Amino acid sequence: MTNSPIADLVHHPERVQSPSLVNSKMNGDAKAVTEWTEPGPAAFDFRSDTVTRPTEQMLAAIAATTLQDDDFRQDPTTLGLEAWMAELTGKAAGLFVVSGTMGNQLGVRAHLQSPPHSVLCDARSHLVTHEAGGVASLSGAMVSCVTPVNGRYMTQADLEAHVNRGTLITDCPTRLVVLEIPLGGVILPLDKCRRISEWARAQGIALHLDGARLWEAVAAGAGSLRDYCACFDSVSLCFSKGLGAPIGSVLVGSETLRERARWIRKSIGGGMRQAGVVCAAARVAVEATFLGGLLKRSHARARDIATFWEIHGGRLTYPTETNMVWLDLEAVGWTPERLIRRGAELGLRFMGARLVVHYQIGDEAIGRLQDLMLEILVSGLVDHPRDS
């Protein structure tokens, strides 16, 4: 019996071609460049690792995926990804969500069920600065922000100094601590993370990790996924930043937390039908980019960029521990706006002094960046000579 075309694609996803490539071949072109075949503008974009483009391998996985209904919990691809992520992180269950913001907000709300309650977190964290006040609107909780004394990452001492124990009738007690690892590319060391975990659990305070870029900390050798995730009651990990998937994150934790988060996800419109379409790409992202070692290459490039900047007289505002390079522009008399404008003239995209080096950044972009760095440093030394 002859296999059907669909069955052939399921067993041989590498044979899948994008529509534009098929049309190109029909028109006689030998090879077409599509949005899926190369990174395009992402190769020159240092704004964020969210600009990474999905790959042809992901497209093949999408074309070969299962198409069952996830609201009925019947899609093998979606269930398989969730179970696999739970296994990788050492948790009991996982839940696919459309974004890191949704993963964080579901995690927070799943923990906070009886107000009054407050959340303790770093003042610079994504939860505070980039999630549209979701903790207040979705969980009815107060956020207490902490600025780490060391200027890099939260410590047990920082938390102890700001925890609200709810001893007075006027208090809003701390019920949840949310950490972000890494934050701004800086890693919270595993031993300090474990101390925070032991302290919080002794206080009866739950712990959630915004691990959108936890992959980067693991790739840097700070600890394994299981090591870090063991410190928390829930963890959100993103597939669409440095890993390059088009969409999605996963929330991992206990089965009870997963079921509560799934109910909340549905209540805010996050339930999905044929979720295998995006889960298939997410699995490829983990396998090819994280397990395939591409993040380590990005880290090496980031270190090279940081070293180039420093050996030519530049300063960094944070150490380069993962894929982010923080330039001290103020020290050389440049503003973020000036960097953005000049970068655009050179075909480079920046969002400020933070450079994010993802795995699709090309050699040409690195060369242009180095030329720009020299320009910045020369002009800065002329305009703002340093004390000898």
Swiss-Prot record:
The modification N6-(pyridoxal phosphate)lysine is found at residue 241. GO terms for cellular component: cytosol. InterPro entries: ArAA_b-elim_lyase/Thr_aldolase, Low_specificity_L-TA-like, PyrdxlP-dep_Trfase, PyrdxlP-dep_Trfase_major, PyrdxlP-dep_Trfase_small. Viridicatumtoxin and its derivative, viridicatumtoxin B, exhibit anti-methicillin-resistant Staphylococcus aureus (anti-MRSA) activity. Moreover, viridicatumtoxin and a C2 acetyl analog, spirohexaline, have been demonstrated to inhibit bacterial undecaprenyl diphosphate synthase, a potential new target for antibiotic development. The keyword Lyase applies. Coiled coil: none annotated. One of its GO terms (molecular function) is L-allo-threonine aldolase activity. It comes from the Eukaryota. One of its GO terms (biological process) is terpenoid biosynthetic process. Pathway: Secondary metabolite biosynthesis; terpenoid biosynthesis. The keyword Lyase applies. SUPFAM superfamilies: PLP-dependent transferases. Its EC number is 4.1.2.-. Pfam families: Beta_elim_lyase. Its cofactor is pyridoxal 5'-phosphate. Keywords: Lyase, Pyridoxal phosphate. Gene3D superfamilies: Aspartate Aminotransferase, domain 1, Type I PLP-dependent aspartate aminotransferase-like (Major domain). NCBIfam families: GntG_guanitoxin. Aldolase; part of the gene cluster that mediates the biosynthesis of viridicatumtoxin, a tetracycline-like fungal meroterpenoid with a unique, fused spirobicyclic ring system. The first step of the pathway is the production of the malonamoyl-CoA starter unit for the polyketide synthase vrtA. The aldolase vrtJ may be involved in the synthesis of the malonamate substrate for malonamoyl-CoA synthetase vrtB. The polyketide synthase vrtA then may utilize the malonamoyl-CoA starter unit, followed by sequential condensation of eight malonyl-CoA units to form the polyketide backbone. Belongs to the threonine aldolase family. This is Aldolase vrtJ.
